[in-house]
Structure formats: structure tokens, C-alpha cells
Amino acid sequence: MNQSILITGANIGIGKEAARQLALKKETKKVILFCRNQSKAEAAKKDLEEKTGKKMFEIIIADVSDANSVRKAVETIKEPIDAIILNAGGVVGKTAGNVTPSGMNVLAATNILGHVILVEELIKRDKLKKAVLLASAEAVPGVKLLGMKPVSMKISSVDEFAAVLDGSYFGDKFEAIEAYGYVKYAATMWMLSMARKYPDIKFVAMSPGNTKGTGAPDNLPPAMKFMLTYFMMPIVFPLIGGMVHTLEVGAKRFVDGVSDERYKSGIFYASKEGKLSGDAVDQSTFYTDLKNTSFQDNADRAIHRFIK
């Protein structure tokens, strides 16, 4: 049972809803909202307290794309944490291809850099006890019906992964939507490598699926945002079936991922092949690169090239 849980990006969307659901579990004693913006975090905390009737929410302010910010935040964590949900991230927006001081582009830094530092620093301090869940995505195995091709790297070498992280893999024209799947692949493979390094801690990668009510469309180009918000999500996806679900359902995947023994360490769970909703299943049954331990370790080594 997880008595204390930290959630990154917990002031909105799936992260906030996961915090609400976790607070209502009888074993939960503390939920830490790990957020970038103080005022938004305070507003989320107030709303969560009102909705749950619980006074168990705490706030830690840090920017997951900034290594030093995360390291400073770790120093403020005095008591062990049972579980962490690495939820912050997404497509990011217009600045996605910009290079950060770490050498990673903004997209990679936001989805990977701070999360790796947070987890590894807490383990080093013996402050992480039971479980880590990473928000991954169906963009990794792809969704044929929507024209989303699976991530396909030549040899998944350290250099290839590093090129994804600094953006050079994509050449002169960096498209965040295309790069997103590759960044999530790198993050997911790091998680699977961690499962082998630390067998006493559960490491699960989990896609929330295609979830309504999140801030995800906000970072898309205007035309795509309009199409997704007003046409695809409310009309097309429900007609197709197995392609969209509510915020509560998406967040429950995360809650179950850290709490339910059905979900095993070292596995990436997401929707069934070709779907974006429904049961969360082991993706390695059809996207077999996930099983390659050399690829997993290559992702880990590539990420650590950018961590000083």
C-alpha cells in the first residue's frame, strides 16, 4: 500500500485527477503536488481539498526541465515517499525544439530530464520505497488508423538516442508531434532499464490513453487544436470506438499502475494495438523492441550524457 505519493504536473488534467483519486483511497496519508507554478499549485491544492474533504496535499515547486531546480526540490524532501507518478510533460509547444542548458531540447528535457534526476536522487538518498510510474504514450507503438507510425530507429544505439534528445536526429525541421513519440520511447526504455537495476522497486510505464479534459491540445498548432477539440474528440473518436475516454478513466490508469499488483515492473502498458482507449496491455507483445535490454541500457546511457 502506498501511503505517500508524489505527482509531477499535478495542478491540472490527469495529474490533478490522479491526485484526487489517490486521496480518496483509505491507505493514502499524503499526496505531494510537484508543480512548476506556485499560484497554480495553490489553486489546485485548494480545489482538491474541497473536492475530497482531505487535508493531505502538500506542494513542492520545481521545473522538471531544469536540472538544478529539481535537485533543489529533492533537498526539501525529508521523509521517504512510497510512490511517484511522473506525469509532467507533453508536446510542449513552439519552444519544443529549443536547446536547454543541459543540451537536451525543451521537449526532451520536459519529459525526461527532471524526472530522471528526481527518481535517481531519491533512490540515492533512500527516499523512494515502492513504485515509480512514467506517463508514456501510444505514440511509441503507433496507431495505424490515425496514420501514427510506430517509433522506428535504425539500431537504437546510444548515439541515436542522444540525437533524439538534442533534436539532431530530426534534421533541420523539428516537428514536436513527430519527435514526441521518440522522446517517450527513450523515457520508456529508461524506465525498463531501471526495473532491472532496482528489482525491489516497481517501475511501470503507462499511457493514460486518449483522454478528454486535459491541457494537451493547448500545445498543438491552432488548426490541429481546433480539429481535435471540436471534431475528433467529441464526434469522430466516440463513433470509431476504443479511441477516447474521460479524464477519470485516464487518471485511473495511473492510480492502478502504482497501486494494483496486476501491473508488473518493467512493462509498458497502453491501449490494445491500434486503439487509444480500453484495457491497458503489455505493449511488448506487438512492439518487440521494448524487450531488448541493450536498447533499454542505450537509452539510459544516452540520457546520462546530458546529466552533469
For the regions a protein language model found, what residue spans apply to each?
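Rossmann-fold NAD(P)H-dependent dehydrogenase/reductase core
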Residues: 1-214, 308
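C-terminal/domain-terminus segments
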Residues: 197, 205-220, 267-288
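Amphipathic terminal alpha-helices
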Residues: 290-308
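Alpha-helical membrane-targeting segments
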Residues: 170-177, 210-212, 216-248
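A structural signal for well-ordered alpha-helical scaffolds and beta->alpha junctions
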Residues: 115, 184-187, 247, 296, ...
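Polar helix-capping/helix-linker motif
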Residues: 66, 259-260, 283-296
